[in-house]
Swiss-Prot record:
Family: Belongs to the KBTBD8 family.
InterPro entries, per the entry: BACK (IPR011705), BTB-kelch_protein (IPR017096), BTB/POZ_dom (IPR000210), BTB/POZ_KBTBD8 (IPR028764), Kelch-typ_b-propeller (IPR015915), Kelch_1 (IPR006652), SKP1/BTB/POZ_sf (IPR011333)
Each Kelch repeat, start to end: 336-390, 391-441, 443-481, 483-532, 542-588
Region annotation Disordered: where it falls in the sequence: 1-25
Identification of the protein by name: Kelch repeat and BTB domain-containing protein 8
Keyword annotations: Cytoplasm, Cytoskeleton, Golgi apparatus, Kelch repeat, Repeat, Translation regulation, Ubl conjugation pathway
Domain of life assignment: Eukaryota
Lineage start: Eukaryota, Metazoa, Chordata, Craniata, Vertebrata
Gene3D superfamilies reported for this sequence: 1.25.40.420, Kelch-type beta propeller, Potassium Channel Kv1.1, Chain A
Main location: cytoplasm
Gene Ontology biological process terms, A to Z: neural crest cell development; neural crest formation; proteasome-mediated ubiquitin-dependent protein catabolic process; protein monoubiquitination; regulation of translation
Gene (name only): KBTBD8
Domain BTB: 49-117
Protein task: Substrate-specific adapter of a BCR (BTB-CUL3-RBX1) E3 ubiquitin ligase complex that acts as a regulator of neural crest specification. The BCR(KBTBD8) complex acts by mediating monoubiquitination of NOLC1 and TCOF1: monoubiquitination promotes the formation of a NOLC1-TCOF1 complex that acts as a platform to connect RNA polymerase I with enzymes responsible for ribosomal processing and modification, leading to remodel the translational program of differentiating cells in favor of neural crest specification.
Binding partners and assembly: Component of the BCR(KBTBD8) E3 ubiquitin ligase complex, at least composed of CUL3, KBTBD8 and RBX1.
Amino acid sequence: MAASADLSKSSPTPNGIPSSDPASDAMDPFHACSILKQLKTMYDEGQLTDIVVEVDHGKTFSCHRNVLAAISPYFRSMFTSGLTESTQKEVRIVGVEAESMDLVLNYAYTSRVILTEANVQALFTAASIFQIPSIQDQCAKYMISHLDPQNSIGVFIFADHYGHQELGDRSKEYIRKKFLCVTKEQEFLQLTKDQLISILDSDDLNVDREEHVYESIIRWFEHEQNEREVHLPEIFAKCIRFPLMEDTFIEKIPPQFAQAIAKSCVEKGPSNTNGCTQRLGMTASEMIICFDAAHKHSGKKQTVPCLDIVTGRVFKLCKPPNDLREVGILVSPDNDIYIAGGYRPSSSEVSIDHKAENDFWMYDHSTNRWLSKPSLLRARIGCKLVYCCGKMYAIGGRVYEGDGRNSLKSVECYDSRENCWTTVCAMPVAMEFHNAVEYKEKIYVLQGEFFLFYEPQKDYWGFLTPMTVPRIQGLAAVYKDSIYYIAGTCGNHQRMFTVEAYDIELNKWTRKKDFPCDQSINPYLKLVLFQNKLHLFVRATQVTVEEHVFRTSRKNSLYQYDDIADQWMKVYETPDRLWDLGRHFECAVAKLYPQCLQKVL
């Protein structure tokens, strides 16, 4: 009887055998993908399609109502509203290109969409009509990643038309950052009055003189003088910060614009000229940035000090992500800072073989953070980054793979418009601890007995006359049409402070006076071009004995080169031991914005 009672509590199964197992919610993780794949197959083969969509130029697409309704509120309303279209076998859509409709349908059946500069705006328009925000956001993300001085105004106008907040904000941010380049473009003249004001009325405008803002307004006005003259007083009132302009410039303003300025002052009312906020670009200061520097109070963690030599102030820049070391560093002609490759420090004190990384990052000045960019095709430590012919090149370096340490021949090129890396012709010889510079659309690479040049247009490497004293781990920079190569290590591992200059036009090396340096201070040097002059940043270590105890002290100094007298002069010494510099520290020079950095001293 008891057994019968137990059986009565069991759950019946399809074959009649009772089961005491609890119910389970089984799920096939591939079910949704499988259905989508089958729907795509039926779409491609025209099976069970029940609606034909006609777009511009009479192009038609046979598809499934339920799929269209599932991804688009526009189609769902069309097919379920009870209106004429809900029963028609064919519907016509106005304002959608055939390629855009094909891309929308491909997204509906596969969740994928292929974007190009040629199709992205038309696809965004179609997604706007069909109310598919996921496609709009993908298009916006693509346009943001492909902003440049030539297209940024057009993208901003496009975003403003469709009311896409992020695309509008990011394109406007880019325009302000690259303002002087952007205002030269023809699209700048197409801005409406309100769009122009929204760009110019900002503290974040990257101009070093307020006169640039005034000149951009005049250029915009002269494009359509009759229609735009009435707007000048309002634009001047909202956008020009006259206290920041030179009196001599204001005095030369033509009477026509002076009258508009007078009206603008009436519209604006009285203001406190002493409290006029400077634009972001007016606060920029050229600084020397030291990478691979460890703060003396934080163990071995890296910090990135920035030295304002003119004012004596010291700031701190956001350290590279993942504490990357021995990265390739580049400051572009547009003052963008890039780092690539490197390695992440090991937790092991005895580990010397580091895993190479393929990271690529760009520094965002306004937020003091690093933005991720497409990874290198080849991981590499200590590569050299060079800007040439509008593109960036990652050259050589080393990895720890297979049988140990290997130098690299490989070279890759980054195109910011395409936002991707491509492989180019490798160097004839593998190189690490090398140097690379650019001059007149050619790249020059130096290491020991090898001196190479690269022509990007021909994708070709060639050999040049090597330096008279072959050295590795030296320092190179272009100065006054010559490549200076300073210091380094010769074949017997002896450190040298030889200075040579290569006249690029004459293909000739000339010895200069050695850099005066005492070997006993164990110096490490870095060569930079600061304020258009050649400088050496020197880390010196002195060891003293006090009461039978060895003590070390370090000094970081800056020496300026006088090419007429052929001599070096100390012009700056850093504050005493704010940080320590490792042997592999690197220096770069860029214009930075103090209010965006953390002040140290």
